[in-house]
Structure formats: structure tokens, C-alpha cells
UniProtKB/Swiss-Prot annotation:
Entries under InterPro entries matching the protein: PS_antenna-like (IPR000932), PS_II_antenna-like_sf (IPR036001), PSII_PsbB (IPR017486)
Gene that encodes the chain: psbB
NCBIfam families referenced in this protein's UniProt entry, alphabetically: PS_II_CP47 (TIGR03039)
Record protein name field: Photosystem II CP47 reaction center protein
Gene3D superfamilies referenced in this protein's UniProt entry, alphabetically: Photosystem II CP47 reaction center protein (3.10.680.10)
One GO process term, biological-process aspect: photosynthetic electron transport in photosystem II
HAMAP family per the UniProt record, alphabetical: PSII_PsbB_CP47
Species for this entry: Gnetum parvifolium (Small-leaved jointfir)
């Protein structure tokens, strides 16, 4: 049977046994990849600094998803939150990864069994003796079972009734931890940043799935609907399944890129919009002002800013700064963050405070411009010194650090001031170790960027796949050249033109 590579799936078109076999093998591959990839990430992951070198800076992809579901401890004796782990058992990173690999092996064996023993009695129609599947009934079974799983996840796992809960944090990603979540049944449940909506929506969707599944098990589709939607054709199942997958992929691409309670910044990194809107900068400023109203000095107020919060306010953690074809973790780009140098405050020779204009997301280079509180340019690093009027030297700009490692240190040397002005364009200033990983200094994206790109791309491809297979199943008769209203017996191969008795072949 000489099939081209893009037609090979036709071998399971009318073979339910082997259709099951290839799906079980696909599950084996998915589970095996997940378990193996988790073990690889655990082998290269460094849990020593959850503040300045979290999993998303190290390019971890599987670990954030495991963590948000309630796994936080390793057999290696560490916890994602920094504490030591004591005998975490099966519900640990290694335990769950190993369970996926064992499950993958069992699926592999069952796929082989179903491929060998494909002609099972359960698949044959007793009226015709030919293989046949009751697809509406199978749809009802799957809908019911997925509804039970969905309801169980929301009602037990997320709420902590029987399970650990999920990762919950504050709006600034500082206090994240695993905890049970109560369902949010009011309007707040529709806020994508409210964790309670995860529980309530899974409970509601699960109940809907259970009811819909029971409906499809007990009510047969009308004949006209059955024929109109080609419910007896396995390619209809393929088309609608692809639709469900691409729809889900588009949704999660959005929740990942724009942020939501399901994609906490402590596990996946900040979103680009938090940089664009100065989200963390405003919170830091609010905290400093609050400290000053408590009669703290500027140095004391800045020293109270958590290093974790300051680190979010750094452009190198913006997922939109990494190019799509720059492979590797963020740490391979600008380096491993070692410490916060502190917040630089620039002043002119009259003592007026100046603010460095920050680099927008989609710029690789940006002029160094210092403005006063009214937004008027007062100093810059000129491109042509011969025509400069606002150079650091001419304006007499100085810089002093508050908080961090350089707390209380000031510089008036123009070369040093310009160095820190350039770095202040990128947000809060951090000491970065580029030697350990031979980092090249070019920004990389976080797992948030990679996940979004991958899912948006495949959603688009699957959308076209849905259109393709939907058209094939709806217009199958046209593509095959058979008139669905044809009453006459059509013998394949008897006529040169199918169904046209005037072109009957000559018997030799």
C-alpha cells in the first residue's frame, strides 16, 4: 500500500482497534516526554537562590507547571520556597516525573497489545459483522468522564478538600505559596487574576460536562442532524477534536502572555505589560513614599524594598525583550543576577532630582535622557559632543545610591555617572554574573514568551487543520464523486466513470 507520508493515517480510518492503539501510543509519548523533561530540568536546576535566580530565569518549562499544581519539594532535600524538604514521598518533583515515566511504559505496552489484537469483538457491528463505532455514544462517555475529572480537580484538588491546593500569590509576586482556594461564585470569579475563579469554573464546567455527557448517553441525535453533521464519520471526530484543541491553545496563549491567576509571575516571570506600564516601579515608589511618611530617611525607605520586587523592575526580565531565535534561558543572556546595587538617584549641580527615561520594550538601543519632575529634558549623553548642551559634564550630574549593595555611595565622576545612567535605562540596577554560564549579554525570553509563541503558532496551524478536516468530512461525497441521492447500485470498478452505466467497461 504505497501511501505518501501525508496520507499514512488512512490506515486507521476503518480500524477501531488500531485507532485506539495509536492514540495510546501518543499518550505514552506525551507522558514519557513530560516525565523525562522534568527529570532533565531537575538535573540542571539550581534551587539555591529563589529570589534572584528563580526557575523562570533558568529556562525551566515543566517545573513551573508542576509547581502551580501544588508540588514544591524535591527528593534532593530542597523546596521551591527555600526551606528544606523532609521525605516528600511520591508527591514531589521526582515522584511525579517517575510516575509519568511508569505510566508512559504501561501505555506503550497497551498500545502494542491493541495493535496486535486489533480485531476485537466489541468493535464489530452484530448486524453487519463489520467494524463499527457508535460515535455519539463514545462522545457521551468521554464528555461524562472529562466532566468528572474537571469537577474533581476543582472541588477537591484546588480547594484542598483532597489535595494541596494551587500556587497563590499577591499582585506583585512576593508572597507566593501553595494553599487551598475557596471557589469564587460572585462576579469576582470572572476576574482572571482571582484564584477562586479557577475552583468555581472547574466545578461549574465539570457539572456541565457531566450533565451533557449523560444527555448524549441517553438521547440519540435526530437522523437529519446525524447525517447533516456526518456524525457517523470518524473524520468528524478528528475535526471537532482539533477545534477543541486549537480553541484551548488560543485561550492559554492569552492567559500566559497577558497574565492571570493560572500563570503567576513567581513561576513564569513578569509580563511585558508590567514593564510597559511601570507596574513594579509604581509599587516601589508607593512603598518608598509610605516609608518617608513614617519619618524614615530616604536610605532607610529604599532599604525596606524587597530585592525580589526590585528584580521584577528590570527590563531583562521582560519576556518581549528576547528574540524568538535566541535559544536558551535568561541566565544565558544577561547573566545570573547576584545582587541589587541599589536605587540610583541623579541630581544636577543645583541639587534638583533627575529621572532617567526608561527604554521601551521594542528598542535595542535608546538615547540616555534625564528629565526633571515636569518631564523637561535637563541632561543627556549626547551622540555628538561638539553640539551638546545637556551633557553630564555640562550639567554637573551626580548619582547617589539608596538601598542595595551601594547604599549611601555617591559618584560625581562623569564617566561613572554615565555608566549608571545607561544602566538605569533598564530599570533597577543589578550585578550580573556573565562568567559562570559564558552569558553573551543578549536578552533572552522567559518561559512565558516561549509558551505563548508555541501555543499561538500551533493554534493557528490547528485552526487550518480543523477547516481542512471539517471540509473533508462535510463534503466527502463531492470529493469522492458519489451523488448522495443515488439510488442505483454502484459497483466500484465496473464503470469508467463512477455511477454512469453508459461507460461500462468491456469484459475482455
Amino acid at each position: 500500500m504505497g501511501l505518501p507520508w501525508y496520507r499514512v493515517h488512512t490506515v486507521v480510518l476503518n480500524d477501531p482497534g488500531r485507532l485506539i492503539a495509536v492514540h495510546i501510543m501518543h499518550t505514552a509519548l506525551v507522558a514519557g516526554w513530560a516525565g523525562s523533561m522534568a527529570l532533565y530540568e531537575l538535573a540542571v536546576f539550581d534551587p539555591s537562590d529563589p529570589v534572584l535566580d528563580p526557575m523562570w530565569r533558568q529556562g525551566m518549562f515543566i517545573l513551573p507547571f508542576m509547581t502551580r499544581l501544588g508540588i514544591k519539594e524535591s527528593w534532593g532535600g530542597w523546596s521551591i520556597t527555600g526551606e528544606s524538604a523532609v521525605n516528600p514521598g511520591l508527591w514531589s518533583y521526582e515522584g511525579v516525573a517517575g510516575a509519568h515515566i511508569v505510566f508512559s511504559g504501561l501505555c506503550f505496552l497497551s498500545a502494542i497489545w491493541h495493535w496486535v489484537y486489533w480485531d476485537l469483538e466489541i468493535f464489530s457491528d452484530p448486524r453487519t459483522g463489520k467494524p463499527s463505532l457508535d460515535l455519539p455514544k463514545i462522545f457521551g462517555i468521554h464528555l461524562f468522564l472529562s466532566g468528572v475529572a474537571c469537577f474533581g480537580f476543582g472541588a477537591f484538588h484546588v480547594t484542598g478538600l483532597y489535595g494541596p491546593g494551587i500556587w497563590v500569590s499577591d499582585p506583585f509576586g512576593l508572597t507566593g505559596r501553595i494553599q487551598p482556594v475557596s471557589p469564587a461564585w460572585g462576579a469576582e470569579g470572572f476576574d482572571p487574576f482571582v484564584p477562586g475563579g479557577i475552583a468555581s469554573h472547574h466545578i461549574a464546567a465539570g457539572l456541565l460536562g457531566i450533565i451533557a455527557g449523560l444527555f448524549h448517553l441517553s438521547v440519540r441525535p435526530p437522523q437529519r442532524l446525524y447525517r447533516g453533521l456526518r456524525m457517523g464519520n470518524i473524520e468528524t471526530v478528528l475535526s471537532s477534536s482539533i477545534a477543541a484543541v486549537f480553541f484551548a491553545a488560543f485561550i492559554v496563549a492569552g492567559t500566559m502572555w497577558y497574565g492571570s491567576a493560572t500563570t503567576p509571575i513567581e513561576l513564569f516571570g513578569p509580563t511585558r505589560y508590567q514593564w510597559d506600564q511601570g507596574y513594579f516601579q509604581q509599587e516601589i515608589d508607593r512603598r518608598v513614599r509610605a516609608g518617608l511618611t513614617e519619618k524614615l530617611s530616604l536610605s532607610e525607605a529604599w532599604s525596606r524594598i524587597p530585592e525580589k520586587l526590585a528584580f521584577y523592575d528590570y527590563i531583562g526580565n521582560n519576556p518581549a525583550k528576547g528574540g524568538l531565535f535566541r535559544a536558551g534561558a535568561m541566565d544565558n543572556g544577561d547573566g545570573i543576577a547576584v545582587g541589587w546595587l541599589g536605587h540610583p538617584i541623579f541630581r544636577d549641580k543645583e541639587g534638583n532630582e533627575l529621572f532617567v527615561r526608561r527604554m521601551p520594550t521594542f528598542f535595542e538601543t535608546f538615547p540616555v535622557v534625564l528629565v526633571n519632575k515636569e518631564g523637561i529634558v535637563k541632561a543627556d549623553v549626547p551622540f555628538r559632543r561638539s553640539e551638546s548642551k545637556y551633557s553630564v559634564e555640562q550639567v554637573g550630574v551626580t548619582v547617589e545610591f539608596y538601598g542595595g549593595e551601594l547604599n549611601g555611595v555617591s559618584f560625581s565622576d562623569p564617566a561613572i555617572v554615565k555608566k549608571y545612567a545607561r544602566r538605569a535605562q533598564l530599570g533597577e540596577i543589578f550585578e550580573l554574573d556573565r562568567a559562570t554560564l559564558k552569558s553573551d549579554g543578549v536578552f533572552r525570553s522567559s518561559p512565558r514568551g516561549w509558551f505563548t509563541f508555541g501555543h499561538a503558532t500551533f493554534a493557528l496551524l490547528f485552526f487550518f487543520g480543523h477547516i481542512w478536516h471539517g471540509a473533508r468530512t462535510l463534503f466527502r461525497d463531492i470529493f469522492a464523486g458519489i451523488d448522495p441521492e443515488l439510488d442505483a447500485q454502484v459497483e466500484f470498478g465496473a464503470f469508467q466513470k463512477l455511477g454512469d452505466p453508459t461507460t461500462k467497461r468491456q469484459v475482455v
